[in-house]
C-alpha cells in the first residue's frame, strides 16, 4: 500500500467512526463502543464496570450513552488542582466526573472529533455548572492524533474505549506524551486483543464503530507506549466486561461471535484493558 493509499485508508476509518458517533449523539443509533447496540440501560453497564450509582445520578441527562469499557477516572486517583485531558470525551461522561474531583482549582479539557458530540457535551455543561457551581470543564473539537492542546500542560490523560478507534494509535500515544507534564500520568480503559481477529470480523464496519475491529494486541499497546517514551507501564486485562456483553446477548457481540471459528467465543479474543503509564 502506497503512502497515499495509507492516508486515504486512515481518513476512511475516521469518517466511518465520525458518522457512527454522530448518529449516536443525535439519538439515531445505539451501536457503538461499550457494546450499547444492546437495549440495556447504560447505567447498568456503567455500574458493572465500576461506576457508582451515586456518581451516575449526578451526571447531566444523556452524558452516559453506554460508551465505556472501564472506569479510568477511578484508576487515575485524581487530586484537587490537576489539569486533566479526556480523549474522545463524547457527551462528557468522564469529564464531568473528573471535574468534580479536581475542583475549582483544577481543569478538565475534553477533546472529540465529532461536532455532534461536542455540541452535546457543551449543552450538558450548563447542567454541570448549575449543579456543582464549577466552571472547570471545557470541550474542544479535534482529533486525538493531533490534540488541540499545548506541550507539557496536562497532569493526567484519561480515555475510555476510544484509542482503539484511531487508525494511527502510535501517533495518539506520541501526542499523549507531548501534552503531559514531566511525571504526568496516563489512565486509560480500552479494548485490546488477546489474539488476532479473523479478517471477516476486522472488515465489519459495525465492529469498527463498536471498538472491536480496530483493537490491537496487548503486546502492541505496550510497544507503542515504550516507543512514545513512557515508563512505569502497567497493562491490566479485565475480562469481565466482554463476559457481561456476552451474557447480555448484545447484538453486535452476537454478530461477531457468529463470524468466529467454531468453538471459539469473544472472550478468547477481546479483553478490556486498563493502561497506566508515566511520562
Regions from the PLM with identified roles:
Residues 170-185:
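A short glycine-rich, Lys/Arg-flanked "PGG" loop and its adjoining helix->strand segment in the class I
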Residues 192-212:
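Short, glycine-/aromatic-enriched active-site segment of Class I SAM-dependent methyltransferases
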Amino acid at each position: 500500500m502506497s503512502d497515499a493509499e495509507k492516508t486515504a485508508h486512515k481518513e476512511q476509518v475516521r469518517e466511518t467512526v465520525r458518522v457512527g458517533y454522530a448518529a449516536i449523539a443525535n439519538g439515531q443509533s445505539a451501536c457503538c463502543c461499550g457494546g450499547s447496540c444492546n437495549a440495556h440501560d447504560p447505567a447498568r453497564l456503567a455500574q458493572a464496570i465500576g461506576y457508582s450509582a451515586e456518581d451516575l445520578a449526578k451526571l447531566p441527562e444523556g452524558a452516559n450513552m453506554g460508551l465505556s469499557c472501564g472506569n479510568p477516572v477511578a484508576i487515575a486517583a485524581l487530586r484537587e488542582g490537576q489539569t486533566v485531558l479526556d480523549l474522545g470525551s463524547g457527551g462528557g461522561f468522564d469529564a464531568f466526573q473528573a471535574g468534580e474531583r479536581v475542583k475549582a482549582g483544577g481543569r478538565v479539557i475534553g477533546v472529540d472529533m465529532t461536532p455532534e458530540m461536542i455540541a452535546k457535551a457543551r449543552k450538558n455543561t450548563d447542567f454541570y455548572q448549575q449543579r456543582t457551581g464549577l466552571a472547570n470543564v471545557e470541550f474542544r473539537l479535534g482529533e486525538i492524533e493531533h490534540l488541540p492542546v499545548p506541550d507539557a500542560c496536562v497532569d493526567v490523560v484519561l480515555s475510555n474505549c476510544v484509542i482503539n478507534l484511531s487508525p494511527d494509535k502510535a501517533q495518539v500515544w506520541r501526542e499523549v506524551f507531548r501534552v503531559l507534564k514531566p511525571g504526568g500520568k496516563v489512565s486509560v480503559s480500552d479494548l485490546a486483543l488477546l489474539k488476532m481477529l479473523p479478517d471477516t470480523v476486522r472488515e465489519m464496519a459495525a465492529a469498527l464503530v463498536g471498538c472491536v475491529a480496530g483493537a490491537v494486541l496487548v503486546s502492541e499497546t505496550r510497544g507503542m507506549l515504550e516507543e512514545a517514551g513512557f515508563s512505569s507501564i502497567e497493562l491490566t486485562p479485565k475480562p469481565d466486561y466482554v463476559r457481561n456483553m456476552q451474557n447480555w446477548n448484545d447484538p453486535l457481540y452476537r454478530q461477531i461471535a457468529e463470524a468466529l471459528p467454531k468453538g471459539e467465543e469473544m472472550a478468547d479474543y477481546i479483553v478490556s484493558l486498563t493502561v497506566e503509564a508515566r511520562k
